[in-house]
Amino acid sequence: MKKLQEAHLRKPVTPDLLMTPSDQGDVDLDVDFAADRGNWTGKLDFLLSCIGYCVGLGNVWRFPYRAYTNGGGAFLVPYFLMLAICGIPLFFLELSLGQFSSLGPLAVWKISPLFKGAGAAMLLIVGLVAIYYNMIIAYVLFYLFASLTSNLPWEHCGNWWNTERCLEHRGPKDGNGALPLNLSSTVSPSEEYWSRYVLHIQGSQGIGRPGEIRWNLCLCLLLAWVIVFLCILKGVKSSGKVVYFTATFPYLILLMLLVRGVTLPGAWKGIQFYLTPQFHHLLSSKVWIEAALQIFYSLGVGFGGLLTFASYNTFHQNIYRDTFIVTLGNAITSILAGFAIFSVLGYMSQELGVPVDQVAKAGPGLAFVIYPQAMTMLPLSPFWSFLFFFMLLTLGLDSQFAFLETIVTAVTDEFPYYLRPKKAVFSGLICVAMYLMGLILTTDGGMYWLVLLDDYSASFGLMVVVITTCLAVTRVYGIQRFCRDIHMMLGFKPGLYFRACWLFLSPATLLALLVYSIVKYQPSEYGSYRFPAWAELLGILMGLLSCLMIPAGMLVAVLREEGSLWERLQQASRPAIDWGPSLEENRTGMYVATLAGSQSPKPLMVHMRKYGGITSFENTAIEVDREIAEEEEESMM
């Protein structure tokens, strides 16, 4: 038996050993797949890239607002519970898939080709998000350049873009010591700068007539794409070095903003508003749903970024440890960002003489209107404004690197012989194509299109993708087999906590989110603008398209097989004959592609019923693996 074990470990994994003679010629395998694919130059590259990917703009402009509107400090209870039930397990699952296979979001579905449509849906979603996400980075660049002046351009009224409604709110009273007659009808200089100068939204007649291209935004968008391209030019080799700055420097700026914020008069008022617990909110299902949504989107599960980054790891990288570092670090960063934001909002509310809830907003309104207005009230306002927008720039770029690397990796893994030698050129073509598709976002009505993309591109479709991935891995491939793969990779099997979450808790939570998003569906809007019916239909179709790619992929997989429908489904759900670790030295145990006493090699099949799946196939290799394990135990006694 020892000779048999040595033969298994010594035997090279070649295409001849992975298929029957009848199969040869039908399958083209890249045996040295990982040799020329590349890896991170260091373990810290991967960790910082994951932190940069997860810690993004949403941590600054979404989490604080969600927290204070859903019970303040009490919101942290469902937030951390959902992190444990949904966030950490799904994060670890996606990292495990990528690292074990060294494959991108498309090729990883060798694990079960029937579900390859889920990988295609990931690419569609991440592609749409990347188009509008870089437009947000372009807005940040615009404000960053505007901060390089002695006086911020949104500090005063009297500019050509201002209207008679513009009012410089310097306190609860006007210059004559009397309250304005109709404070609600006035507009701050920062709001008019954003809507009338940056967006020039008054030049649009709606989403159907977006107006002319704003060339200043067009150039900022071009610069954003040039920066992204240069940083991903050499794949993870280059982006992995850039994140040493872009993933760490935001924390320095956040710390500076936090220290400055808490020293302002009225800061404690804002912090109290942010964190004062209101436990009666926990009785509302909406609060729990909001917590789950925040976890789901902030960790970036389902976009393929985590899977892609992990695919460049060495086979034994400790992603279990990395999972907890990144997920808990992301949560702590969100909480700290809330302190930095609400301390300044508290100061702002005291200066204006209005309640905190009248100055608190979420999303672009916070980043491009409220916070810039607060900056004008500080000494050295251009300096603090520059720091704030530089922080947003680095936060946004990290996520954008992941989006583009996901697309490039997925396609090059599908066509390695054609695209991998020209990966830089292919990356450039992707950036050019997305820049051209994003030009509509630089028009007068571009914000309408951005809102539509933001509302629908990664909504219910993303939840369906993650549910499908979770069920395909745990129910079809098999939870026991998946845990065995992780044991081969990390040296231990996931415990009951992870198994229970993967099998029941995480899919159930995601299903609840999906049902909630459908039941509570509300049409898109931007300010007072209501989107026309055709735009709503377009958005819904956008979300449905990613969902439909899953059954479409199933249909293609089934049509490629032979036999009855049930036989086709069985065959399509089997792992591909070359599924497993990409490097020969890591293909041990059940992945050693020879069978004891066999004259001719056979494909490596998976005993799915024994390992938790729904199909059953012969696999003598598992019996050999069991015998080897038993002999090892006897030798240790």
Swiss-Prot record:
Residues bearing Phosphoserine are S22, S573, S582, S598, S600
The record describes the protein's role as: Brain specific sodium (and chloride)-dependent proline transporter. Terminates the action of proline by its high affinity sodium-dependent reuptake into presynaptic terminals.
Report the residues modified as Phosphotyrosine: Y591
Membrane side Extracellular: which residues? 138-214
Q: Name one Pfam family in it.
A: SNF
UniProt-listed InterPro entries: Na/ntran_symport (IPR000175), SNS_sf (IPR037272)
Q: Between which residues do disulfide bridges form? A: none
Q: Which residues cross the membrane?
A: 46-66, 74-93, 117-137, 215-233, 242-259, 295-312, 324-345, 378-397, 425-443, 459-479, 500-519, 538-556
Glycosylation sites (chain numbering): N182
Gene Ontology cellular component list: glutamatergic synapse; plasma membrane; presynaptic membrane; Schaffer collateral - CA1 synapse; synapse; synaptic vesicle membrane
Q: Which keywords appear in this protein's UniProt record, sorted alphabetically?
A: Amino-acid transport, Cell membrane, Glycoprotein, Membrane, Neurotransmitter transport, Phosphoprotein, Symport, Synapse, Transmembrane, Transmembrane helix, Transport
Provenance organism: Rattus norvegicus (Rat)
Name its cellular compartments.
Answer: Synaptic cell membrane
| Phosphothreonine: residues carrying this PTM | T20, T588
**Membrane topology reported for the UniProt record:** Multi-pass membrane protein
Per its UniProt record, what PANTHER family does this chain match? SODIUM-DEPENDENT PROLINE TRANSPORTER, SODIUM/CHLORIDE DEPENDENT TRANSPORTER
Gene name as annotated: Slc6a7
This protein is called Sodium-dependent proline transporter
Q: In which tissues is it expressed?
A: Expressed in subpopulations of putative glutamatergic pathways of rat brain.
UniProt KW Kinase keyword: no
Tell me the protein family, please: Belongs to the sodium:neurotransmitter symporter (SNF) (TC 2.A.22) family. SLC6A7 subfamily.
Q: Provide the membrane-side ranges marked Cytoplasmic in the record.
A: 1-45, 557-637
In the record, biological process GO terms are: glycine import across plasma membrane; neurotransmitter transport; proline transmembrane transport; proline transport; protein catabolic process; sodium ion transmembrane transport
